[in-house]
Amino acid sequence: MSRAKGAKAEEIGALFLQDLGYKIIDRNFYAPFGEIDIIAQKGGVLHFVEVKSGANFEPIYNITPLKLSRIIKSAQYYLKQKKITPPFCVDALILRGGEVEFIENITL
């Protein structure tokens, strides 16, 4: 996915989350292990959200065990940098053909 397409998908994802009552805390957070697309909060829980989009395939398949491991390490790095210890989870926002699917607390 090009940077422009990725940025557009992340913008759509952030607006989608806001419509669901999430507060966007940060976007495109870079850690030594990788990037977190969106960091949002709802009900005292931090959500580290990976955004994937695609028209000709299932974007969820791009979240591999290695990618999930890097997201978790990046989330832990974020929490350590901010010196906070809230409950958190890793979510996926899938954009496909104009539709948005939100998958909370992904595991592989």
Curated annotation (Swiss-Prot):
Q: Name one GO molecular function term.
A: nucleic acid binding
- Give the domain of life: Bacteria
Report the family membership: Belongs to the UPF0102 family.
Name of the protein in question? UPF0102 protein WS0451
Species source reads Wolinella succinogenes (strain ATCC 29543 / DSM 1740 / CCUG 13145 / JCM 31913 / LMG 7466 / NCTC 11488 / FDC 602W)
